Amino acid sequence: DSNYLSVENNAVIGNQSGVYIDNSPMLPDIITLFKGNFFAYNDVGVSALPSVARNAFQGNAFIDNLQQASTLGRGNLLKNMWQVDGVGNYWSDYVGYDSDGDGIGNVSYRVEKLFESLTDEYPLLRLFTYSPASQSLNFAAVAFPSLRPDPKVIDEAPLMHYTIPAHIAQTDSTPSMSFLVVSLILLGLGGAIFLFTLYPIRLNHTAPITTHETQGAKS
């Protein structure tokens, strides 16, 4: 529960939920701003109660989260702002287009997958994410609009590109010398074990000696 909160330029990667909003902001006429954040490879990018309102999202990147946005139970997140001053967010599963090349999609981004709506009500169903059953349900909702659930999120100005936060982009990815030394040692041990298995050393091995008896010629 917070007020006067601004969450900017964070990288949230590989968590159960990138951000969870319960009752923020608390006071009326207060807006919480999420700007320039990087939510990637989480189970859920942003999760909130359906009653949550007045949260503004601008310039965030939602990258390959199993579920980009989720409500806890029935409802939606439409009482929040998913674009500010004509600038929305980047969504990795957005399939729209940018006809005028301004970097903003001409088609709104919507979170309205049938299987995701079911998992919001029945979380245990997430075990079947990416299963043939979940894909079939989503395909059926696309083919038959009457099955399509109400959207939970509508971003009217989705971004076509995203920017990696500076503190991630500048991370030195060059392997250290100690890492290389340990790797070479492990490779050497692995090679020695392989050769020993392929050509085992036989100890105390003696070749059999064959003896031949000779009989003298009888006179």
Regions found by a protein language model. Give the residues of each.
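Short glycine/acidic-rich loop motifs that flank beta-strands on beta-rich extracellular proteins
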Residues: D1, Q16-D22, D43-L49, L66-L72, ...
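Alpha-helical transmembrane segments
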Residues: L189-R202
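Juxtamembrane/start-of-transmembrane alpha-helix segments at the extracytoplasmic/lumenal side
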Residues: P165-L189
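Acidic, glycine-anchored loop motifs typical of Ca2+
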Residues: D98-E116
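Juxtamembrane amphipathic/hinge helix adjacent to a transmembrane helix
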Residues: I104-R110, Q135-T171
